[in-house]
Each structure stands twice: as C-alpha cells, then as structure tokens.
C-alpha cells in the first residue's frame, strides 16, 4: 500500500465537495440568468405595450 495514495473516503469527500460546488454554481448562474431575462422581458413588454398604445391613438 503506497503512502502517496489518499484514503478512499477522502477522495469520495473531495468528489462530493466538487459536485456540490458545481451544482451551486450552475444553480446560481441559472437563477441569475432567469431573473435578468424575466426582468428584460417585462421591460420589453411594458415598452412595447406603451408604444402600441401611443401609436393606436
């Protein structure tokens, strides 16, 4: 048994930590993207509605 090789549970723990970090990163990125896209969509709808009302009169 070589001393350089880390224990199995340590490797598993590291993989779990990496998985958690990646999941958190992806989740936060998708949430931020979703919020900004929703905000832009609502702004666009509002301006489009105002433009259509102005041009219908």
UniProtKB/Swiss-Prot annotation:
UniProt entry tagged with the keyword Transmembrane helix: yes
- Tree of life domain: Viruses
Which compartments does it reside in?
Answer: Virion membrane; Host cell membrane
Gene Ontology cellular-component terms for this entry are: host cell plasma membrane; membrane; virion membrane
Q: Which key words are in the record?
A: Host cell membrane, Host membrane, Host-virus interaction, Inhibition of host NF-kappa-B by virus, Membrane, Transmembrane, Transmembrane helix, Virion
Which ranges make up the Intravirion topological domains here? Answer: 30-57
Residue intervals annotated with topology Virion surface? 1-8
Write down the Pfam families for this protein, in alphabetical order: SH
What is its membrane topology?
Single-pass membrane protein
> Which InterPro entries does the annotation name?
SH
What's an example Gene Ontology biological process for this entry? Answer: symbiont-mediated suppression of host NF-kappaB cascade
Residues annotated as transmembrane: 9-29
Q: Which family does it belong to?
A: Belongs to the rubulavirus small hydrophobic protein family.
Quaternary structure (record): Interacts with host TNFRSF1A, RIPK1 and IRAK1; these interactions interfere with host NF-kappa-B activation at the level of receptor complexes. Interacts with host protein UBQLN4.
Cited function: Plays a role in the inhibition of the host NF-kappa-B pathway. This inhibition occurs at the receptor level, by preventing the signaling of TNFR1 as well as IL-1R and TLR3.
- The entry's protein name is Small hydrophobic protein
Name the lineage.
Answer: Viruses, Riboviria, Orthornavirae, Negarnaviricota, Haploviricotina
């Amino acid at each position: 048994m070589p001393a350089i090789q880390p224990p199995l549970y340590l490797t598993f723990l590291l993989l779990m930590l990496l998985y958690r970090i990646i999941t958190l990163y992806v989740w936060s990125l998708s949430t931020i993207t979703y919020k900004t896209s929703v905000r832009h969509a609502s702004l666009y709808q509002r301006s489009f509605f105002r433009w259509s009302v102005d041009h219908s009169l």
